[in-house]
Amino acid sequence: MKEVNKEQIEQAVRQILEAIGEDPNREGLLDTPKRVAKMYAEVFSGLNEDPKEHFQTIFGENHEELVLVKDIAFHSMCEHHLVPFYGKAHVAYIPRGGKVTGLSKLARAVEAVAKRPQLQERITSTIAESIVETLDPHGVMVVVEAEHMCMTMRGVRKPGAKTVTSAVRGVFKDDAAARAEVLEHIKRQD
């Protein structure tokens, strides 16, 4: 996959600084283009990662009931404004045929999908589809809640407003009780 071109990012950041009337050569900004390029390489590292790769490790386990990893912290960049949004992902699935993956793999997949220019809706559905395609579970449910800086620091300026998205597949789509169980676990504070 294509690597991030840090040199090109540095040049672009210098141009942005000049375009807003700043001097990119002043002391406080001198290393800013390099810092931004390094940061972009990190926060967009998911562009070079397929979330499905995290589900290649499968354990044969006779468990066909709910598995839920909740409160997976993530951060991403809004593809419309290139400003951060951040929050928590909750990932649930019901294994089929003994195909269980490591719990950390669910968190790693969230991170891989989030670390790219993104929409929250796409994060949610991509995680769900990755699990469906690799583990073939009875059902998958992904709920993502996030605060978007594009709504906090510009435009409508509504700090604290959270956006919630969900992707529901398989048994969770058809069984209201199964859906309710996941939502109840998510809601519960320990």
Swiss-Prot record:
GO MF annotation list: GTP binding; GTP cyclohydrolase I activity; zinc ion binding
Gene Ontology annotations for the cellular component aspect, listed alphabetically: cytoplasm
EC assignment: 3.5.4.16
Tagged with keyword Cell membrane: no
Enzyme kind, highest EC tier: hydrolase
PROSITE patterns linked to this entry: GTP_CYCLOHYDROL_1_1 (PS00859), GTP_CYCLOHYDROL_1_2 (PS00860)
PANTHER family: GTP CYCLOHYDROLASE 1, GTP CYCLOHYDROLASE I
Record's subunit section: Toroid-shaped homodecamer, composed of two pentamers of five dimers.
Similarity comment text for this entry: Belongs to the GTP cyclohydrolase I family.
Protein name, UniProt field: GTP cyclohydrolase 1
